[in-house]
UniProtKB/Swiss-Prot annotation:
Domain of life: Bacteria
Protein name: Uracil-DNA glycosylase
Origin species: Phocaeicola vulgatus (strain ATCC 8482 / DSM 1447 / JCM 5826 / CCUG 4940 / NBRC 14291 / NCTC 11154)
Stored InterPro entries: UDG_fam1, Ura-DNA_Glyclase_AS, Uracil-DNA_glycosylase-like, Uracil-DNA_glycosylase-like_sf
Catalytic activity: Hydrolyzes single-stranded DNA or mismatched double-stranded DNA and polynucleotides, releasing free uracil
Gene3D superfamilies, sorted: Uracil-DNA glycosylase-like domain
Top EC class of this enzyme: hydrolase
Length: 220
């Protein structure tokens, strides 16, 4: 199957594209786009991969589901398009960056600038029906994104994996802590941010680790 995804990822994930689950997933997603309003727009489904080639990945942040409101999702977890109000979790992420690094709250919630520096902003599920959170879960996306995380964890070294909340922590449970830095805390959602997300200093800790391993820090 010829999947429109960045070339290095296409090579590393090629076995997945031929598996039965992925063929079924593709048929389901194609049908959904034809019959319902689906986010993100089709050209952005693999945006996280397209902006961040396999060998350029320094950091992986694992999200769960795309935003399901109009104009928000563009294929990067937690990120929104320019001009879109910050969802609460993103607002809290920026607050933690401000507290941790002293950086001002940005004017845009578009995290393409992180992706361009090697931050893979990967949702576990890559599509969703408008206004129906979780509507495309358990259709095969989770298996596909597990494969992407696994191939990174096995074939690369010294990546920072950031796991916020129990869902992301379960998804990243297999990552070898001797080869990579795994940072885990509560989720930035208002429901849990005060239970260990605020004050986790994940952004400074990421940069310290990258610099210790000869890599350029991220401009958060």
């Amino acid at each position: 199957m010829n999947v429109q995804i960045e070339e290095s990822w296409k090579q590393h994930l090629a076995p997945e594209f031929e598996k039965d689950y992925f063929i079924r997933l593709t048929e389901f997603v194609r049908s959904e786009y034809q019959t319902a309003t689906i986010y993100p727009p089709g050209r952005f489904i693999f945006n996280a991969f397209n902006l961040c080639p396999f060998d350029k990945v320094k950091v992986v942040i694992i999200g769960q589901d795309p935003y399901h409101g109009p104009g928000q999702a563009h294929g990067l977890c937690f990120s929104v398009n320019d001009g879109v109000p910050f969802p609460p979790s993103l607002q809290n992420i920026f607050k933690e960056i401000q507290s941790d690094l002293g950086a001002p709250i940005p004017t845009s919630g578009n995290l393409t600038r992180w992706a361009n520096q090697g931050v893979l902003l990967l949702n576990a599920t890559l599509t969703v029906r408008a206004h129906q959170a979780g509507s495309h879960q358990r259709r095969g996306w989770e298996e596909f994104t597990d494969a992407a995380i696994r191939v990174l964890a096995e074939q690369r070294e010294n990546i920072v994996f950031i796991l916020w909340g129990s869902y992301a922590q379960k998804k990243g449970a297999f990552i070898d802590r001797n080869k990579h830095l795994v940072l885990a805390s509560a989720h930035p959602s208002p429901l849990s941010a005060y239970n260990g997300f605020f004050g986790n200093k994940h952004f400074s800790r990421t940069n310290e680790y990258l610099q210790a391993h000869g890599q350029t820090p991220i401009e958060w």
